[in-house]
């Protein structure tokens, strides 16, 4: 199989989802560097980066458990549409300048509550066979989102005052 059809197989969707989680992790790692002068904030972003890499590992394990027939099967249209939305989301955020913690929070909030985690949830729900592991992964996503939502409360009025290092 060659050409555009290759992009439409389930295996490619998994590969892109893995790349997406790693890319989000890189964004969070960059945030940790930008806020390295505020240890609590740096630690928050460092942990978020680790979580994203764990998600990528889970997706990789799930992909490796699929049969060749599954890997070459056509994915649901919803998965393909989510991949296109994710590309647009990254294009949008690649141009955004981060000047303070509030800017970083806005990017992270949009990523965590976007197609990035929607796609992760769908792939987990449909292809992780162990119910215990599936529930763990899905609860991890919810916990991750809660951590992002609670960031403004944690730093209250400091969100715009905590500038990037050198900013």
Regions found by a protein language model. Give the residues of each.
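Non-heme di-metal
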Residues: 1-167
């Amino acid at each position: 199989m060659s050409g555009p059809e290759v992009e439409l197989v389930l295996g490619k969707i998994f590969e892109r989802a893995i790349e997406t989680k790693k890319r989000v992790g890189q964004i969070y790692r960059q945030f940790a560097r930008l806020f390295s002068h505020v240890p609590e904030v740096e630690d928050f972003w460092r942990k978020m980066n680790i979580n994203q890499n764990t998600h990528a590992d889970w997706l990789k394990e799930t992909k490796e458990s699929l049969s060749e027939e599954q890997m070459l099967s056509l994915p649901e249209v919803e998965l393909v549409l989510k991949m296109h939305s994710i590309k647009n989301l990254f294009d949008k955020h690649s141009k955004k300048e981060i000047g303070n913690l509030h800017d970083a929070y806005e990017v992270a909030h949009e990523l965590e509550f976007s197609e990035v985690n929607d796609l992760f949830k769908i792939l987990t729900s449909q292809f992780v066979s162990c119910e215990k592991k599936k529930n763990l992964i899905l609860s991890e996503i919810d916990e991750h989102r809660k951590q992002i939502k609670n960031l403004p409360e944690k730093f209250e009025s400091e969100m715009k005052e905590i500038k990037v290092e050198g900013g």
